[in-house]
Amino acid sequence: MSAATEANGHHVGQSLRRKEDPRLITGRARYVDDIELPGMLWAAIVRSPEAHAKIVSIDTSAAAEREGVHAVYVGADMADLGGPLPCAWSPEGFNNPEHWPLARDTVKHVGDPVAVVIGDDRYAVVDAAEDVVVEYESLPVVTDPEQAIEGGPLVHEQFGTNKVFEWSLPGGDIEAGFAEADVIVERKFVNHRTAGAPIEPRGVLADYRAGALTVYSSTQVPHFLRLFLALLLGISEERVRVVAPEVGGGFGSKLQVYGEEILLAWCSRKLGQPVKWIETRTENMAVSHHGRDQISQIKIGAKQDGKITAYHVKILGDFGAYNMLLTPVIPVLGAFVMGGCYAIPAVQTDIVGVFTNKNPTDAIRGAGRPEATHMIEITLDQLAAELGIDRLELRRKNFIPRDSFPHATATAVTYDSGDYEKTLDKLLEHLDLEAFEREREELRAKGVYRGIGFSTYTEICGLAPSRITGPKGLGLAAGGWESAMVRVHNTGAVTVYTGTSPHGQGLETAFAQIVADKLGVDPANVEVIHGDTGTGPEGRNTYGSRSLAVGGEAIARSANKIAEKSKQVVAHHLEAAPEDIEVRDGKFSVKGSPDKGMTLAEVAGAVYIYDIPDGMEPGLEETTFYDPENFVFPFGAHACVVDVDAETGKVTVARYVAVDDCGNAINPLLISGQVHGGVVHGIGQALYERIHYDEDGQLVTGTFVDYALPTAAELPSFELDRTTTPSPVNSLGSKGVGEAGTIAASAAVTNAVIDALRPLGVTYMNMPLSPMRVWEAITQAKEGAPA
């Protein structure tokens, strides 16, 4: 048994170290860039320097004559492709332009691909790509979404508008709610554009031979990718295999069917050789999809005692130049939790998506929920100041009561479980607010302004119940189920095949813990296979904090089936009733007689030599396809303490405390790791990170010199705690946690900065809270300008 195992044999709930780490820290892990195949060629992609232009001509002759160059292709060469790149949702009135792996007539943003060069050597094809001469006829550019929607230059002329779609989620009587309000607060939020910036950029290696295609890709969605490779290339799906080897982070930016994946597969089939492309960091920042980029107008009404009566949000989403796999879905996810943790009787979200001449947006960690949480949490602080009510008391007054779960919200979803008072109470146990006020005064005398900000959040994850999101519900062209196959070998070793595709979360460890408890084995003897469509059943991949709540439940159900069959075998051998057999201390034993039992290895031995009850099929292998009945809704309360230098505007995060509730914990160590990473991501957006284009559509922040990511040097040690409110949706009682920190953090940081600067007259700010922006806010406040 593992050292962390309790006496009763339970591994779930223990902080086991990650099974994945030895191969990663010893350099034995294999990423796409580590894979080489005989006869492998390299690809370099020629990209547009123009944000919007007509392609007049492309001269590839000089590049094609380069030594070692095998081929140069342009969009016209791919006329045999079965269709454009996919978007999974097409609501009524949806404008969806064709989006091809290589642009055909016009380019719509800087970085749009126009040609690909294939050759023997990685660096030679990059040089050859510079010999491709493209003549462009520049067209008008629009990068401001408000200008785009108000009559700016058209990105796609065929639609006669830059509007992608309109979508509303009304709940309750919004007009009556505002009529009832004593106080109304209105604000404009700008949730700026960010990048996923994984440590490993994307990479693709395509190998077509003998009528079969294998694609190695740094992707979160190998099963989706296989489907669209088959459809677009006209290859029977069983002849297509997608492998996601080690994936060095994704954060949503690899939740995509990218043009490069289709392009390289097409090139490999055309040339009859493997073709590889590894994204540069510059390409990653320019053409891997971005996130956020919403401008929102909010209006909230409340009674004088603080009870909120109505909340209305109007979102203008900058989708960039094209709709990608889930582009229009992102603000919709936020709409489902727009009311946050609060019992607001009327909530309405109106969404307008708009095209601009920028890289497309799609899911980045949190995907709509950080934007929603940021708005409601900043707004509550603004409302509290307007009412003269303590901001925490305002939250408590409006929390959904703990005894009202499951709770049907005004935003068309039912929260599964929650206890928001409990997480806030535990958070305050970590904070000595009286001491904080003393420290605040001492620091202010030195010219340092200290503030504390709070963020109480809930999120929607465990995507997704197919009845809600699928064709019969929201209309997504995919079910939200997940699959798992559990196989017990002759020796009692266990292999798990999961349809979800981990990429850094530690799920090999968590899944092994679940199976270990179900079958009475050591997690070390449980191997988890993932990210390969050639093994195991069809799956739905990794996104939306779904891997544990949906994928883990599928695994648990398969393991339960094996456990039940094993109990019948043990009962047969021990002459006991199956219902009297339990899994305890590493074996299947008779209740009350722990000395009478069989290990899983002994059970497997009996099954495979066919010493089993009459009528039982041999084998210990079970498959489950699990479709949840509901989403799961993790929640928590975070606090951030910042120090602001009033002379320079520099913000320093002095302390960060987080209390999260993700239901029953499978591995607390993994939870802490996920919260750590998520909080850093949220702090990064609040203070440092920003994707910025100039008015000509040129990317200004295309490197890590310009796009500032936080490092350990900018951050304190985080203080983490948890409460436990099990979910009734799955048998594990668990919820997701991978995005929680990001969802809470930006609001906590922003509220802290505003709290610090309130004595100087600053009452409101939009992110990122850079030194220049903070200094300008202080200066304007001193001059009496409105915040």
Spans of model-derived segments:
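C-terminal catalytic domains of large/alpha subunits in multi-subunit enzymes
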Residues: R66, G75-A76, G234-R239, R269-V275, ...
